[in-house]
Amino acid sequence: MLKRTTKIAFLSSFVALSAFSVSAEDMQFGVTPPQITAQTYVLMDYNSGAILTALNPDQRQYPASLTKMMTSYVVGVALKQGKIHNTDMVTIGESAWGRNFPDSSKMFLDLNTQVSVADLNRGVIVVSGNDATVALAEHISGNVPNFVETMNKYVQQFGLKNTNFTTPHGLDDPNQYSSARDMAIIGAHIIRDLPEEYKIYSEKNFTFNKIKQANRNGLLWDKTINVDGMKTGHTSQAGYNLVASATTSNNMRLISVVMGVPTYKGREVESKKLLQWGFANFETFKTLEAGKEISEQRVYYGDKNSVKLGALMDHFITIPKGKQSEVKARYELADKNLQAPLVKGQVIGKVVYQLDGKDIASANLQVMNDVGEAGIFGKLWDWLVLTVKGLFS
């Protein structure tokens, strides 16, 4: 594999989530994380995907109402694709009747009434209504099992290794589980893919049928940290769970997940500790700009002699504060002799980022333009060039 060290201009602006390979639990760089009381937790940077600190991040837990984040994702996609509309009126059937969910969170749906998709969606996100999840599941997919199947299709699509859903609401089931890492990834997808859906997560209250209920995410009221959403969950077996996301004035966004916290208030305290620690000790910056060339490479057997290399997506890394000038980058090609045909977006190597002598992240290196095949004489010439080159390598 060809390795080349190259100077890459690091940019300071921030945009959408990017896919990065990061060295997970080793991301602390000697920065001592806070003491967190939870069975499992994760702190992830939204833009880079870096895990800044974690405890048992892949341990399977009962998600409780964190399940509703995936329910919300399915609903948001259906709205975005025009399969359903906020103004659609949904008739509440027997299975979605609020009376079927005693001693659990609900929006108090009455049998045979009609409720808009917009209200039901808020019932899911803001007040964690179990009845609302069933009503939306039946409206979108015809029945709950079909809806759950769609939820699990997204589990596969997102590459989640420790998640399986059996309900849209999250009440405990032996075959329903998720992990802190997987919930952070689901949260990032909601923020990135469905910005209109994510806006609802910041709403502090929801009134339906003259019943006003508050969002259970108490961090939305905390003026010392800019939390703008995500979801709580609790059952006796799950303990207290919370996914929270917050931003800073320079557009850094973190996602925290705590699961299995012993107390209601504790999940907010532990989440806040994680978020404040992350913002105090780390910074995220853009390393590759979408569509911008970072290098040019010789191509053989092509109708062009060279091809531009770069990335089709913005890419970011997260490092300890004050370390940006110490980051080094190199690019590695899978094959030192690139051969046509090449297609725009084709991955031909990677850019590797290093700090303090350790590889900390990598991004796909892609072809920035198509390269077709050369004619017979061009191919013959390049064959001769490579043959001679091989004799001296």
From Swiss-Prot:
Metabolic or biological pathway, per its Swiss-Prot or TrEMBL entry: Cell wall biogenesis; peptidoglycan biosynthesis
Signal peptide range in chain numbering: 1-18
Pfam hit, one: PBP5_C
Alphabetical list of InterPro entries matching this protein: Beta-lactam/transpept-like, Peniciliin-bd_prot_C_sf, Peptidase_S11, Peptidase_S11_C, Peptidase_S11_C_sf, Peptidase_S11_N
EC number in record: 3.4.16.4
Alphabetically ordered keywords of this record: Carboxypeptidase, Cell inner membrane, Cell membrane, Cell shape, Cell wall biogenesis/degradation, Hydrolase, Membrane, Peptidoglycan synthesis, Protease, Signal
UniProt key word Protease: yes
Keyword Protease listed: yes
Annotated catalysed reactions: Preferential cleavage: (Ac)2-L-Lys-D-Ala-|-D-Ala. Also transpeptidation of peptidyl-alanyl moieties that are N-acyl substituents of D-alanine
GO cellular component: plasma membrane
Domain of life: Bacteria
Residues that coordinate or bind substrate: K231
Membrane topology: Peripheral membrane protein
Gene Ontology biological process: cell wall organization; peptidoglycan biosynthetic process; proteolysis; regulation of cell shape
Localisation per UniProt entry: Cell inner membrane
MF GO annotations: serine-type D-Ala-D-Ala carboxypeptidase activity
Active-site feature positions: S65, K68, S128
PANTHER family in the cross-refs: D-ALANYL-D-ALANINE CARBOXYPEPTIDASE, TRAFFICKING PROTEIN PARTICLE COMPLEX SUBUNIT 12
Biological role: Removes C-terminal D-alanyl residues from sugar-peptide cell wall precursors.
Family statement: Belongs to the peptidase S11 family.
UniProt protein name: D-alanyl-D-alanine carboxypeptidase DacA
